Amino acid sequence: MENITIETEFIKLDALLKFAALTATGGEAKQVMADGMVAVNGETCTMRGRKIRPGDEVTFAGHTLHVQSAQ
């Protein structure tokens, strides 16, 4: 599991995948979500604009990201 620290209230799912270098572009992030390859808190998520908040866990391609607040 990898911890990702954000300084804002939330980060959009597609931006998180790019920030964590799990996808190279927003288009790639959109495609892997549309294909049902991303899970948020254990549930498949296809909404690229989903707001990911501290405490959420995102899983993709064998990686699990735990989002935490910088504060």
Where are these regions (language model features)?
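A detector for short, charged/polar N-terminal pre-domain segments
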Residues: 1-8
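Generic structural motif recognizing short loop/turn segments at the entrances and edges of beta-strands
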Residues: 2, 36, 63-65
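A basic, amphipathic helix-loop patch mediating RNA/tRNA/ribosome contacts
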Residues: 11-54
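C-terminal structural segments of small proteins and small subunits
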Residues: 44-71
